[in-house]
Amino acid sequence: MLKRTTKIAFLSSFVALSAFSVSAEDMQFGVTPPQITAQTYVLMDYNSGAILTALNPDQRQYPASLTKMMTSYVVGVALKQGKIHNTDMVTIGESAWGRNFPDSSKMFLDLNTQVSVADLNRGVIVVSGNDATVALAEHISGNVPNFVETMNKYVQQFGLKNTNFTTPHGLDDPNQYSSARDMAIIGAHIIRDLPEEYKIYSEKNFTFNKIKQANRNGLLWDKTINVDGMKTGHTSQAGYNLVASATTSNNMRLISVVMGVPTYKGREVESKKLLQWGFANFETFKTLEAGKEISEQRVYYGDKNSVKLGALMDHFITIPKGKQSEVKARYELADKNLQAPLVKGQVIGKVVYQLDGKDIASANLQVMNDVGEAGIFGKLWDWLVLTVKGLFS
């Protein structure tokens, strides 16, 4: 594999989530994380995907109402694709009747009434209504099992290794589980893919049928940290769970997940500790700009002699504060002799980022333009060039 060290201009602006390979639990760089009381937790940077600190991040837990984040994702996609509309009126059937969910969170749906998709969606996100999840599941997919199947299709699509859903609401089931890492990834997808859906997560209250209920995410009221959403969950077996996301004035966004916290208030305290620690000790910056060339490479057997290399997506890394000038980058090609045909977006190597002598992240290196095949004489010439080159390598 060809390795080349190259100077890459690091940019300071921030945009959408990017896919990065990061060295997970080793991301602390000697920065001592806070003491967190939870069975499992994760702190992830939204833009880079870096895990800044974690405890048992892949341990399977009962998600409780964190399940509703995936329910919300399915609903948001259906709205975005025009399969359903906020103004659609949904008739509440027997299975979605609020009376079927005693001693659990609900929006108090009455049998045979009609409720808009917009209200039901808020019932899911803001007040964690179990009845609302069933009503939306039946409206979108015809029945709950079909809806759950769609939820699990997204589990596969997102590459989640420790998640399986059996309900849209999250009440405990032996075959329903998720992990802190997987919930952070689901949260990032909601923020990135469905910005209109994510806006609802910041709403502090929801009134339906003259019943006003508050969002259970108490961090939305905390003026010392800019939390703008995500979801709580609790059952006796799950303990207290919370996914929270917050931003800073320079557009850094973190996602925290705590699961299995012993107390209601504790999940907010532990989440806040994680978020404040992350913002105090780390910074995220853009390393590759979408569509911008970072290098040019010789191509053989092509109708062009060279091809531009770069990335089709913005890419970011997260490092300890004050370390940006110490980051080094190199690019590695899978094959030192690139051969046509090449297609725009084709991955031909990677850019590797290093700090303090350790590889900390990598991004796909892609072809920035198509390269077709050369004619017979061009191919013959390049064959001769490579043959001679091989004799001296």
UniProtKB/Swiss-Prot annotation:
EC number: 3.4.16.4
Species assigned in the record: Haemophilus influenzae (strain ATCC 51907 / DSM 11121 / KW20 / Rd)
Protein location: Cell inner membrane
Name listed for the protein in its UniProt record: D-alanyl-D-alanine carboxypeptidase DacA
Binding residues annotated for substrate, in chain numbering: K231
Function per UniProt: Removes C-terminal D-alanyl residues from sugar-peptide cell wall precursors.
Similarity comment: Belongs to the peptidase S11 family.
GO terms of molecular function: serine-type D-Ala-D-Ala carboxypeptidase activity
Residues at the active site: S65 (acyl-ester intermediate), K68 (proton acceptor), S128
Keyword Protease part of the UniProt annotation: yes
Pfam families membership: PBP5_C (PF07943), Peptidase_S11 (PF00768)
Membrane topology term: Peripheral membrane protein
